[in-house]
Amino acid sequence: MKKIAVLTSGGDAPGMNAAVRAVVRYGVRQGLEVIGVRRGYSGLIDGDFVKLEYKDVAGITEKGGTILRTSRCEEFKTEEGRELAAKQIKKHGIEGLVVIGGEGSLTGAHLLYEEHKIPVVGIPATIDNDIGLTDMCIGVDTCLNTVMDAVQKLKDTASSHERAFIVEVMGRHSGYIALMAGLVTGAEAIIVPEIPVDYSQLADRILEERRRGKINSIIIVAEGAASAYTVARHLEYRIGYETRITILGHVQRGGSPTAFDRRLALSMGVEAVDALLDGEVDVMIALQGNKLVRVPIMEALSTKKTIDKKLYEIAYMLS
């Protein structure tokens, strides 16, 4: 193997740049030519390639986002689109591809291998932390720290005004961010997709806390469980006083990655290159315990990952 490529796809996650840097620098050290694909799978279809040298990735570890840019590509979801991408790969003599992204990106990588035998290795990078067989994905730790900081600031103002604040965080199918953020900030309630919410019970609990002298409440909601506005409407009807809504949105994706995310991304980038050189393809690099392992991409994607119900109960008891 003499030439490999790397791309970032889907939603960005803090630490993607660190992974790109590791793939490039370690690849060059192994005597490989490394090509960067701009704009994810859209760039793969269009042939938007750039050769990356050692110096091109200097100083990017600490930067959020991705220097390669990213996109969500509808064309790549079609067989015709993937065929165009495969032709570009072969035309440019690329012998292996590292894909950094979430569920959709990794599915695309698997299809490239299944349909066109393109050697691929995936690196999980998504703040939702919803990919199976890996304890953590790149970007999750940074996102949690961002949410924790924001909620702590909201608690300051909530206590000043004796209000209930409803904070909506990302998590379409997974309540991981909501659960962990709620646990570490002492939120009064956590609403996640995995557990049905009873608004009457929630309102009763907040009112009981009021009777005990607690003058403010923080409710953290995963976007996939309910909208913050829906929660606010139900609560205001039942508790009789106003709430305030904060939707953190895309601020959760940004920021300089934490030390944990940097280390994870750098290690996964190196392992991905090694996997290609070893001929172990159609695999994803996963963190299990304190070790990096290689697992089949589709096995990871077909393994349902859910929140820790016991941890949810602990968060409830400690709030």
Curated annotation (Swiss-Prot):
Keywords from the UniProt entry: Allosteric enzyme, ATP-binding, Cytoplasm, Glycolysis, Kinase, Magnesium, Metal-binding, Nucleotide-binding, Transferase
Keyword Nucleus carried by entry: no
One cellular-component annotation, GO: 6-phosphofructokinase complex
Gene3D superfamilies named among the record's database cross-references: 3.40.50.450, Phosphofructokinase domain
SUPFAM superfamilies tied to this protein: Phosphofructokinase
Domain of life: Bacteria
GO biological process: canonical glycolysis; fructose 1,6-bisphosphate metabolic process; fructose 6-phosphate metabolic process
Cross-referenced Pfam families: PFK
Record entry for activity regulation: Allosterically activated by ADP and other diphosphonucleosides, and allosterically inhibited by phosphoenolpyruvate.
EC number annotated for this UniProt entry: 2.7.1.11
InterPro entries tied to this protein: ATP_PFK, ATP_PFK_prok-type, PFKA_ATP_prok, Phosphofructokinase_CS, Phosphofructokinase_dom, PKF_sf
PANTHER family membership: ATP-DEPENDENT 6-PHOSPHOFRUCTOKINASE, PHOSPHOFRUCTOKINASE
NCBIfam families per the UniProt record, alphabetical: PFKA_ATP (TIGR02482), PRK03202.1 (NF002872)
Function summary: Catalyzes the phosphorylation of D-fructose 6-phosphate to fructose 1,6-bisphosphate by ATP, the first committing step of glycolysis.
Protein name: ATP-dependent 6-phosphofructokinase
Gene behind this protein: pfkA
